[in-house]
């Protein structure tokens, strides 16, 4: 399942489908989150920054007021690596929405398509917020998503990982699932339940400085 397919599905009507369209993304909240990402302090207005000795290798769920509308869960984490006995990392704000399946792992074709359409609409609404922010430019498009980066000329021409970034990623859900009622001709990459992640990342830094 590629972002392009998701975008096409988002343009199809939802009439007769089971899933409701999620609420549109809040661009004011997006702008606020980017401002916090720029500080490099780990979205401390959303959840308290711990310390360089207590980094968020596990997720800190964000309060409802700071969650992008339409998603199942939002959290803050620290992407950490440790070269030369130092702690480097990049704070990340992540929101995720996943398809809803039955407890048995079964998912009907109609529900699957409706949820993908709704997910596509939600993805487009968030991407519209990113594109409306003139500080961002397209970084790359891949089969799994789209990445935007704050223009380096606005941040002193720092390298890519020294700039705030916004990413939209679509990926298969982990687990065993059974899609029922699907046409035989349905491509394999459209038979798996999917999840959508929106990531707003701050600049990488030496966390011990």
Which residue ranges define each predicted feature?
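N-terminal leader/targeting segments
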Residues: 21-94
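Negatively charged, low-complexity tracts enriched in Asp/Glu with abundant Ser/Thr
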Residues: 26-32, 40-55, 112-113, 135-157
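Short, exposed beta-strand-loop hairpins at the edges of beta-sheets
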Residues: 183-189
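Bacterial N-terminal signal peptides that target proteins for export
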Residues: 1-10
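Short, low-complexity, Pro/Ser/Thr/Gly-rich segments in the mature regions of secreted, periplasmic
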Residues: 192-209
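Bacterial N-terminal signal peptides
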Residues: 9-18
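Long, charged/polar, surface-exposed segments that mediate recognition or autoinhibition
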Residues: 69-150, 154
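Ser/Thr-rich, low-complexity intrinsically disordered terminal regions
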Residues: 53-70, 139-167, 173-175
């Amino acid at each position: 399942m590629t972002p392009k397919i998701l975008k096409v599905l988002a343009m199809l009507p939802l009439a007769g489908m089971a899933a409701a369209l999620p609420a549109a993304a809040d661009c004011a909240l997006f702008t606020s989150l980017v401002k916090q990402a720029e500080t490099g302090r780990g979205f401390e207005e959303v959840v308290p920054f711990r310390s360089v000795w207590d980094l968020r290798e596990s997720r800190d769920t964000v309060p409802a007021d700071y969650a992008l509308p339409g998603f199942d869960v939002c959290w803050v984490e620290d992407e950490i690596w440790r070269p030369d006995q130092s702690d480097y990392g990049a704070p990340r704000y992540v929101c995720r929405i996943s398809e809803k399946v039955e407890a048995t792992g079964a998912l009907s074709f109609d529900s699957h398509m409706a949820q993908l359409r709704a997910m596509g609409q939600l993805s487009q609404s968030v991407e519209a917020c990113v594109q409306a922010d003139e500080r961002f430019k397209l970084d790359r498009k891949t089969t799994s998503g789209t990445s935007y980066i704050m223009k380096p000329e606005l941040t002193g021409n720092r390298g890519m990982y020294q700039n705030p970034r916004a990413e939209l990623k679509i990926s298969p859900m982990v687990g065993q699932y059974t899609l029922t009622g699907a046409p035989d001709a349905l491509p394999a990459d459209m038979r798996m339940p999917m999840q959508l992640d929106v990531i707003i990342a701050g600049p990488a830094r030496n966390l011990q400085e």
